[in-house]
């Protein structure tokens, strides 16, 4: 029976220990980078659908677009880090931004659906993943 000792270079071991200490911080930066990519696409899609294809002149105040944003990165009880794109509440008139966004996304009786969230999610997936990978590589290379 043979015995093998593998000794890793000190520099590599130091990087691994630093990475272990800053994992949460690095993951948050990567999630924020990916979230910004998707947020930009959602804003672009929302601007395109508001007021388009209506019988009457749009009454849009721009409040829905302004309330769109990213949540801070939070960790759930399973240890997963999450970031969300959504609307801040409440509106100045007391109604819900989420309700208005839902009506635009899925439509209602007499108003056709104008999806802006689902197309943004599917079309920005690759760009989001690449932005997250790039940020992760940059942060790891700084160690």
Walk through the language-model features, giving the residues of each.
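Short, Lys/Arg-rich flexible segments
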Residues: 1-84, 92, 98-143
């Amino acid at each position: 029976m043979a015995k093998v000792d593998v000794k890793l270079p000190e520099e590599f071991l130091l990087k691994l220990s630093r990475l272990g200490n800053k994992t949460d911080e690095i993951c948050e930066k990567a999630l924020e980078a990916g979230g910004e990519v998707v947020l930009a696409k959602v804003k672009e899609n929302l601007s395109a659908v508001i007021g388009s294809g209506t019988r009457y002149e749009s009454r849009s105040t721009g409040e829905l677009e302004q309330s769109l944003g990213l949540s801070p990165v939070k960790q759930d009880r399973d240890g997963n880090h999450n970031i969300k794109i959504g609307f801040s509440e409440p509106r100045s008139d007391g109604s819900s931004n989420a309700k208005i966004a839902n009506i635009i996304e899925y439509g209602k009786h007499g108003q056709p659906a104008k999806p802006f969230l689902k197309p943004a999610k599917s079309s920005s997936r690759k760009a989001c993943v690449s932005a997250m990978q790039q940020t992760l590589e940059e942060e790891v290379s700084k160690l």
